[in-house]
Amino acid sequence: MINFLTKLLLYFSIGLAPLFITSQTNEIQIKFIGNCGLFMTDGTINLYVDFPYKSGAYSYMEYENEEIEQIKENAIFLFTHKHADHYSYKLLKPFEGEKYGPWNVEELKELESKSLDFQIEPFRTEHKVYGISFKHYSYVITWHGKRIFLSGDTGDVEVIKSLKELDLAFMNPWMFMNLQNERIPVETKMFGIYHLYPNEKLPEKVPSNIIFLKEQGRQISISYE
């Protein structure tokens, strides 16, 4: 895997500017919880992506119970699919708030009527396990004019290769591999590589425009005007 990740660094670091900025007042703050689990906030809207999930499912990342205890009231919950390393009905059920996933993506349009600065666009993407297809969506969040892509578990590159002017693209390693194999550039300022195994070995030198999300609790900030 280390050779694969090193090649990815060389391929995706060409001609891209860093995005990690923390000096501005107006920021979208992003916290990496584990797997594809993220918490995002601008101080008004609180969004959880692929969280809560079953801690340690399929030998992926565990997390402390305090992550559940700290979930904000009336947050928005967004899920790419229902596999246990991304979603837990049992853990999600007690929380109020708006909950979106493959079962009701058409309702995401209602968010546009509530805030001109926050929209989520769903894209049906392929996800197969042992040849069996599962209902799966990737998303583009447009927030204060900033565009954030969320791959989830898909390796399907048809959506990402058509997207323009992304500020941050969260991707799993197998999507990276498919993009490299097909020599497809991605129009984004920053990559966040997530859904790594806890024991994943990473290159020692990493370009500033690529973040390997292995350290749980890692913070990313995107400034906006």
What are the language-model segments listed below?
Residues 2-45, 202-209, 214-225:
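Zn-dependent metallo-beta-lactamase
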Residues 128-186:
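Active-site-proximal loop/helix segments of hydrolase catalytic cores
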Residues 48-52, 73-89, 100-103, 149-153, ...:
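Active-site neighborhood of phospho(di)ester-bond hydrolases with catalytic His/Asp-centered motifs
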